[in-house]
């Protein structure tokens, strides 16, 4: 696997030496409101060179760790299933090589491809989901493969009690009714995350972490396809990431930056910092990092 031409800052390890591998899925063909998430991965990489590799929040530096950036997949915008198959194949390759796959979206549907790969290796997989939206619709305008349905499709893979949702503040009534029966849904913020993390640590179950950046309040992150008022702050998200990464996280993704929707550049800068902090939290040697 060869490195991308423009890598995320500090992620210049070789593939052989790396413990974490970045890969991008620039896909937004099912976006229901404002498109542009396909430009997210490239924007994050490009703008990262205005960011320091050092994190004052965690007193660690990206260059302390071995992280490889494999670049973006070439995905078929006309076929969601084809795109998901390509994402699954790349995630499976990284997992097979004993490394940690971290996916950059793209719209949230891309998560399904990565989860398909993860659940084949880890049948008892749990999913921790940060998002403004429940994403539990059975279909959206007749489409089963939609960013609005991604956690419903993931539920079909992992089953009841294996999906833990936080910051949810948008969805139709049927989604919340479904969640009450089949997932663990926490509205508005990260209340309950510390208790969940303790349970996940005790059980040592494998965990997939998916972060939709629209969990952030639009005042600090307006550049996303479906912004929702009332989100969490950057510091709240950082604290949540540092908390949940104590569990046995085996793969993760970061998605839904649409950089062209925020010409100030604030959203892209925020996404860069969230990615830096996530990489450091994952690779600081937490007991849970057990790929």
Give each language-model segment a name.
Residues 1-291:
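Conserved alpha-helical scaffold segments that buttress catalytic/binding sites
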């Amino acid at each position: 696997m060869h490195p991308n031409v423009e890598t995320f800052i500090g992620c210049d390890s070789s593939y052989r030496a790396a413990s974490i591998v970045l890969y991008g899925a620039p896909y937004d063909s099912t976006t229901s409101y404002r498109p542009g998430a396909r430009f997210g991965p490239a924007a994050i990489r490009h703008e990262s060179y205005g960011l320091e590799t050092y994190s004052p929040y965690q007193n660690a530096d990206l260059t302390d760790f071995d992280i490889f950036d494999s670049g973006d997949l070439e995905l078929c915008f006309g076929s969601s299933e084809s795109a998901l198959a390509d994402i699954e194949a790349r995630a499976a390759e990284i997992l097979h090589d004993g490394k940690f796959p971290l996916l950059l979206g793209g719209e949230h549907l891309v998560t399904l491809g990565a989860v398909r790969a993860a659940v084949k290796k880890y049948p008892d997989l749990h999913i921790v989901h940060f998002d403004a939206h429940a994403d539990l619709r059975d279909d959206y305008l007749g489409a089963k493969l939609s960013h609005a349905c991604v956690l419903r499709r993931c539920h079909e893979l992992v089953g009841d009690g294996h999906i833990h949702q936080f910051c949810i503040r948008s969805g139709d009534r049927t989604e919340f009714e479904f969640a009450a029966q089949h997932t663990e849904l926490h509205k508005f913020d990260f209340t309950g995350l510390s208790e969940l993390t303790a349970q996940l640590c005790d059980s040592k179950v494998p965990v997939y972490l998916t972060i939709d950046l629209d969990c952030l309040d639009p005042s600090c992150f307006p550049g996303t396809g479906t912004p929702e008022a009332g989100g969490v702050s950057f510091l709240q998200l950082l604290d949540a990431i540092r908390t949940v990464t104590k569990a046995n996280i085996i793969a993760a993704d970061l998605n839904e930056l649409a950089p062209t929707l925020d010409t100030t550049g604030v959203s892209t800068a925020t996404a860069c910092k969230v990615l830096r902090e996530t990489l450091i939290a994952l690779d600081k040697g937490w007991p849970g990092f057990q790929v």
